[in-house]
A protein has these predicted regions:
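Non-ligating segments of multi-cofactor redox enzymes
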Residues: 3, 8-20, 32-304, 313, ...
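Bacterial N-terminal signal peptides
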Residues: 23-31
Length: 341
């Protein structure tokens, strides 16, 4: 009977995922055929978080200057509105993940993120470009301070709730998740593979920072999948190569960009090491059944002969382990109150 129920549940979840994929495909077609004609009227992250350079004619009393100032003001206001909506959704997700019934809304969060932040907004705003603008400002570039809010605000939110942004709100992570089809690619699920992918992420972050220091410009936007995958008019062929590689690998690997490249996920993961940060861990109820390990697609949970351990740097707070554990052996803690397992 239990086996039958598991099969029914698996078929049900599979049908839900197919429904979401159909919805996303419809929006993809709509984005190409209809929204593509109006994309110029929508502020994309390439414009909103671009490097801001003051015009040499700044201060002139011409009508054109006044119009440009008004346009810039509207763009900034529009960008801040969307950033605040994203931050609110992230806080909401941080609360929802604590409750079993509300965790079921995660798929709705992800689909909404892809539709609004992806197909409607063209990948705007982009957290990576917000992160880059911090460095550009420190390097003396003239940057709109409003573009810094996105990344900086994610730091305290992650401290309070963990990486819920990655697991519930990020539109690129959501897209990879819905593309993912199979977990049979076992070679990339080992502890050694996880360590190698983390090292690759560190090198990617260092490369990004070095590029910013040497060039004082945002060259990464030419290959940034956060925006490129949702902006079909982008001319950068190298970027499209990486996007194609990401889409193909997402079929076999769970969130490959998140696991190997994304600097935002890496930095937000480091927040879990700060004393007082919200973390997940196993408690005394753990019977080493390995269910949570099997449920964890991001491979944040490791298992030995004694009990399971959770690596909060990798955990995206999807809640699958919390829902799957029948012994309530996984709980929320604070870094200062309990050592992470």
């Amino acid at each position: 009977m239990a086996f039958f129920n598991q099969n029914i549940c698996g078929v049900y979840l599979g049908s839900i995922k197919k429904t979401y994929l159909i919805i996303l495909l419809l929006f993809f077609v709509l984005d190409v055929s209809v929204l593509g004609n109006t994309k110029d009227s929508i502020t994309t992250s390439l414009e909103e978080f671009k490097e801001y350079k003051v015009d040499s004619s700044f201060g002139a009393t011409s009508v054109n200057s006044a119009t440009q100032l008004l346009t810039d003001h509207n763009e900034v206001s529009n960008g801040i509105y969307w950033v605040l909506m994203i931050l609110f959704a992230t806080i909401l997700a941080g609360i929802f993940v604590h409750f079993k019934n509300l965790r079921q809304l995660r798929s709705l969060f992800l689909v909404t993120s892809i539709i609004l932040l992806g197909f409607y907004r063209g990948g705007c705003p982009c957290p990576i470009q917000s992160f880059q603008n911090i460095f550009l400002m420190l390097l003396g570039q003239s940057i709109k301070w409003q573009s810094l809010i996105y990344f900086l605000a994610l730091l305290p939110i992650t401290y309070l709730f963990g990486r819920v942004f990655c697991g519930w709100v990020c539109h690129l992570g959501a897209l990879q998740e819905f593309i993912f089809m199979t977990s049979d690619f076992k070679i990339l699920q080992s502890k050694k593979a996880q360590k190698i992918m983390r090292i690759i992420r560190i090198f990617a972050l260092l490369s990004l920072v070095i590029q910013l220091i040497l060039t004082h410009s945002n060259l990464y936007k030419k290959i940034d999948p956060f925006t490129l995958i949702f902006n079909f008019q982008n001319p950068y062929l190298v970027g499209w190569f990486f996007v194609g590689l990401m889409i193909l690998s997402s079929v076999f690997i769970y969130r490959p960009f998140c696991k190997t490249i994304c600097p935002i996920g890496l930095i937000l993961g480091w927040i879990s090491k700060i004393p007082g940060a919200s973390i997940l861990g196993t408690n005394e109820n753990c019977i080493s059944c390995n269910i949570c390990n099997n449920k964890c697609k991001i491979r944040a949970i490791t298992h030995d002969n004694k009990m399971s351990g959770l690596e909060n740097e990798e955990c995206i707070r999807c809640g699958d382990c919390l829902t799957g554990c029948k012994k309530n052996a996984i709980s929320f803690f604070h870094k200062t109150k309990r050592k992470q397992q």
